[in-house]
Curated annotation (Swiss-Prot):
The lineage of its organism: Bacteria, Pseudomonadati, Pseudomonadota, Gammaproteobacteria, Lysobacterales. The keyword NAD applies. NAD(+) binds at residues 48-53, 74-75, 111-112, 140-141, 245, 274-276. PANTHER family: ENOYL-[ACYL-CARRIER-PROTEIN] REDUCTASE [NADH]. GO terms for molecular function: enoyl-[acyl-carrier-protein] reductase (NADH) activity; NAD binding; trans-2-enoyl-CoA reductase (NADH) activity. NCBIfam families: EnoyACPredFabV, PRK13656.1. Involved in the final reduction of the elongation cycle of fatty acid synthesis (FAS II). Catalyzes the reduction of a carbon-carbon double bond in an enoyl moiety that is covalently linked to an acyl carrier protein (ACP). Disulfide bonds: none annotated. GO terms for biological process: fatty acid biosynthetic process. The gene is fabV. Substrate binds at residue 226. Keywords: Fatty acid biosynthesis, Fatty acid metabolism, Lipid biosynthesis, Lipid metabolism, NAD, Oxidoreductase. This is Enoyl-[acyl-carrier-protein] reductase [NADH]. Pathway: Lipid metabolism; fatty acid biosynthesis. It comes from the Bacteria.
């Protein structure tokens, strides 16, 4: 079928399979250009492997270090009459090109919060991956979590704590500057956000993997976080989501103590703000990203997801000099270091009050934001003919969990 973008709110409801594949190929090429190292992870499990930072982790492990990878995600496959989600096509493309490079690649499509997913992962590690993994990446960004056992569904809330938060934002449907107000989260919403977005599920995964004996000696685990700056703190770090990320930090400290006994470790990696399906949903982030992209591009500091993950693997987790990674006071790996430079943040703060609907495209990189957003779904690529027919029913080596 012929597919063009249709945007509703912060979601693009259509996806382009070929565009998604080209996006993945672009990330593979960027990784290969930095050379393949053999002194890093060999068997890698990625939870939340189909888009954003999780996908970039999988690409970096496979094409930067020659690792075998197992990816878990929750995506909608395409059919002959309807396109699937971008993550489905991203994962299909990854699988195709990893196999072409002679690498083991297997995927599981299902609820990563479920015990069934853990059981299937353990089975595959034992039967197909030599029995153990040496790196587990935790990269889930889900608004909903069904609790294993009880089946109770919890939802996260992107809300401030204590008082209503009002700030300048972009109405991305109309490309206008608005004042957005968000009511504060209730105590229950805060608790539920911690349950969905905190470290509980990460710990359940490590419990299961360790209990089954499928974590190698020296195995590492990393989970992703974002802290940001005072511009976004009310909605993020000081909001309900921030409480979940603090819980993630506490979890990392517990897991690190456990894995360190066998020569491994666990860290939270704090990454920079990028255009992903997850960040597009957070109020104020599109405007902040549009500003920070412009400033960082001007300073030659801009990075996308693949550049961030490349730096995380090569300069932090698996340093060529064999030294332990540099961490902050909370034992976190900081990849937001360039974004948080004073010269970058001071420029952002100076720019923020000046932005209006009239000068939005001129003062910020909102055009770049819109381009990157549509690109997530396979659109806006110059190497794809969007008026040509494209097959939407794409299958690959993926186990469907019922």
């Amino acid at each position: 079928m012929i597919i063009h973008p249709k945007v509703r709110g912060f979601i693009c409801t259509t996806t382009h399979p070929l565009g998604c594949e080209r996006n993945v190929l672009e990330q593979i090429a960027a990784t290969r250009a930095r050379g393949v190292r053999t002194d890093g992870p060999k068997k890698v499990l990625v939870i939340g492997a189909s888009s954003g930072y999780g996908l970039a982790s999988r690409i970096t492990a496979a094409f930067g270090f020659g690792a075998d990878t197992l990816g878990v995600f929750f995506e909608k496959p395409g059919t002959a009459s309807k396109a699937g989600t971008a993550g489905w096509y991203n994962s299909a493309a990854f699988d195709k090109h990893a196999k072409a490079a002679g690498l083991y690649s297997k995927s599981i499509n299902g609820d990563a919060f479920s015990d069934a997913a853990r059981e299937k992962v353990i089975e595959l590690i034992k039967t197909e991956m030599g029995g153990q993994v040496d790196l587990m990446v935790y990269s889930l960004a889900s608004p909903v979590r069904k609790l294993p056992g009880s089946g109770e569904v919890k939802r996260s809330a992107l809300k401030p704590i204590g008082q209503t938060y009002t700030a300048t934002a972009i109405d991305t449907n109309k490309d206008t500057i608005i004042q957005a107000s968000i009511e504060p989260a209730s105590a229950q919403e805060i608790e539920d956000t911690v349950t969905v977005m905190g470290g509980q599920d990460w710990e359940l995964w490590i419990d299961a993997l360790e209990g089954a004996g499928v974590l190698a000696d020296g195995a590492r685990s990393v989970a992703f976080s974002y802290i940001g700056t005072e511009i976004t703190w009310p909605i993020y770090w000081h909001g309900a989501l921030g409480k979940a990320k603090v819980d993630l930090d506490h979890t990392a400290q517990r897991l690190n103590a456990r894995l360190a006994r066998r020569g491994g470790g666990a860290n939270v990696a704090v990454l920079k703000s990028v255009v992903t399906q997850a960040s597009a949903a957070i109020p104020v982030m599109p405007l902040y990203i549009s500003m920070v992209y412009k400033i960082m591009k001007e300073k030659g500091l801009h990075e996308g997801t693949i550049e961030q993950l490349d730096r995380l693997f090569r300069e932090r987790l698996y340093r060529e000099d064999g030294q332990p990674a540099q961490v902050d006071d909370e034992n976190r790996l900081r990849l937001d270091d360039w974004e948080l430079r004073d010269d970058v943040q001071d420029a952002c703060k100076a720019l923020w009050p000046q932005v209006t609907t009239e000068n939005l495209f001129e003062l910020t990189d909102y055009a770049g934001y819109k381009h990157e957003f549509l690109k997530l779904f396979g659109f806006e690529r110059t190497d794809v003919d969007y008026d040509a027919d494209v097959a939407t029913d794409v299958s690959f080596d993926c186990i469907e969990l019922g």
